[in-house]
């Protein structure tokens, strides 16, 4: 049984609302769902914000799908493992994690993330998951100083990479650039961890753990990255039980639903599927994969909409029902001792789908050009604001910047907070206002700032 200490909030609350019988995790879910940071996801594209097609997913619709898959995983595990029903005590908790998992991602996806990481290279770096942790615990104005003031277990679940930047960062041999246009993302991969500026919250989240559990949970190892030949930084090794479900749901949504977008838009073809995916499925060591998925490409690439949707449903169902609970008995705390994992053959199949999306969608020159453009916009905005914060920042952000300066804190983090919260469209228009001679009045922009 998990301890009640995991339901505690950093800032104690004594709100007594009339006839409010919601659980702590139902309250967490409501706070996330009604937050401005969550709403902004509707204007941040997931992968395919290309052209005039309105079919593609945004980060908001992606997060809703991750939530649906996450609760589906939990329901399956409750049936398979009745002995673990205490671990799976709240669907609202898992919904909260899935809905919130992308809240910290900046405008223009990976391009914006790399740009902010480069501009913050001497000030603690930038990474989307670290920013999510920061928004939930400090920035979103549900409370004055404690962000959404979520339960400790919710904050533990959002920690995909439970170690601070300083413990993971390895100084690399970067090529010096004289112009922002020369920046190569492969040379500036973000450190996957939380920011040192948020170590106080990190320590509070891990407070209930034994010293041994805390030490092992935050331990690191030499990193690797599927998109990079050499990832220079260290990586974390562990995540909580709730986080493992959220991450699997995210992976399934990314691999299956982003693939669906790409098929509909003609970016991934049947011949590419048969070349890159079909052989792995046909030769799988799992009988269900061989029988059900080997020929699924015919449905996926059918012009009959209902056949394609049926195939997508089959893929999602296959992965969700192949998830098991594994145990690592080195941990004492049940939330760390147990993790949700995919059966090995299904993990191979999911990875093949993810690689297909990466190869033909993410690396597509048109997508990379959009990322590059976003990269330039974000770096240009950061450079401008850093040059004269008290002149160019909105008044409320100026105040945060001044407070940070006066307290001897990392004032550059305030700039990263402001820019990372922008939508793609707002960042683009603000860039035009600052740098284009033909841009119009600032009145409309000022209303949004």
Curated annotation (Swiss-Prot):
Q: Where is the composition biased (Basic and acidic residues)?
A: 7-27
Query: Which residue positions does the secretion signal occupy?
Result: none
A family per Pfam: HD
Write down the HAMAP family for this protein, in alphabetical order. Answer: dGTPase_type2
Question: Could you tell me which PANTHER family the record lists for this protein?
Answer: DEOXYGUANOSINETRIPHOSPHATE TRIPHOSPHOHYDROLASE-LIKE PROTEIN 2 (PTHR11373:SF40), DEOXYNUCLEOSIDE TRIPHOSPHATE TRIPHOSPHOHYDROLASE (PTHR11373)
Question: Which species is this UniProt entry from?
Answer: Shewanella baltica (strain OS185)
Record-linked PROSITE patterns: HD
Known SMART domains for this protein? HDc
What UniProt keywords apply to this chain's record, in alphabetical order? Hydrolase
Q: Which family does it belong to?
A: Belongs to the dGTPase family. Type 2 subfamily.
Q: Where is this region: Disordered?
A: 1-27
Query: Could you tell me the superkingdom of the organism this chain comes from?
Result: Bacteria
What is this protein's name? Deoxyguanosinetriphosphate triphosphohydrolase-like protein
State the Gene Ontology BP annotations. Answer: dGTP catabolic process
Q: Where is the HD domain?
A: 59-255
User: Which InterPro entries does the UniProt record give?
Assistant: dGTPase, dGTPase-like, dNTPase_2, HD/PDEase_dom, HD_domain, PHydrolase_assoc_dom
Q: Name one GO molecular function term.
A: dGTPase activity
């Amino acid at each position: 049984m998990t301890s009640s200490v995991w339901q505690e909030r950093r800032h104690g609350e004594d709100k007594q609302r009339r006839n409010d019988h919601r659980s702590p995790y139902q309250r967490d879910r409501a706070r996330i769902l009604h937050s401005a940071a969550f709403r902004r996801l509707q204007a941040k594209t997931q992968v395919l914000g290309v052209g005039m097609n309105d079919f593609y997913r945004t980060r908001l619709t992606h997060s809703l799908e991750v939530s649906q898959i996450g609760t589906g995983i939990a329901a399956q595990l409750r049936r398979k493992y009745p002995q673990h029903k205490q671990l799976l005590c709240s669907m609202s908790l898992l919904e909260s994690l899935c809905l919130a998992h992308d809240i910290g991602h900046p405008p223009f996806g990976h391009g914006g993330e790399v740009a902010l990481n480069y501009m913050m290279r001497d000030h603690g770096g930038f990474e989307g998951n670290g920013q999510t942790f920061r928004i939930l615990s400090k920035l979103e104005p549900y409370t004055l100083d404690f962000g959404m003031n979520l339960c400790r277990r919710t904050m533990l679940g959002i920690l995909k990479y439970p170690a601070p930047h300083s413990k993971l960062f390895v100084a690399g041999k970067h090529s010096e650039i004289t112009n922002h246009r020369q920046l190569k993302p492969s040379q500036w991969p973000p450190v996957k961890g939380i920011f040192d500026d948020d170590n106080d919250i990190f320590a509070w989240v891990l407070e209930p753990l034994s010293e041994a559990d805390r030490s092992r949970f935050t331990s690191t190892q030499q990193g690797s990255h599927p998109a990079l030949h050499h990832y220079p930084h260290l990586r974390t090794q562990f995540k909580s039980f709730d986080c493992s479900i959220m991450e699997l749901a995210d992976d399934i949504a990314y691999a299956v639903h982003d693939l669906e977008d790409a098929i509909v838009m003609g970016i991934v073809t049947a011949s590419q599927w048969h070349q890159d995916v079909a052989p792995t499925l046909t030769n799988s060591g799992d009988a269900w994969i061989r029988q059900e998925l080997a020929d699924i490409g015919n449905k996926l690439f059918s012009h009959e909409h209902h056949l394609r949707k049926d195939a997508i449903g089959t893929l999602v169902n296959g992965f969700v029902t192949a998830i098991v609970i594994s145990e690592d008995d080195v941990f004492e705390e049940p939330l760390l001792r147990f993790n949700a994992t995919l059966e090995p053959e299904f993990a191979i199949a999911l990875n093949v789908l993810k690689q297909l999306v990466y190869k033909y969608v993410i690396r597509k020159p048109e997508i990379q050009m959009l990322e590059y453009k976003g990269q330039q916009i974000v770096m240009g905005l950061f450079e401008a604001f850093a040059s004269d914060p008290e002149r160019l920042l909105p008044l409320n952000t100026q105040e945060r910047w001044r407070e940070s300066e006066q307290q001897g804190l990392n004032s550059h983090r305030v700039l990263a907070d402001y820019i990372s919260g922008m939508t793609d469209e707002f960042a683009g228009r603000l860039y035009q206002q600052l740098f284009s001679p033909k841009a119009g009045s600032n009145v409309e922009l000022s209303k949004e700032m």
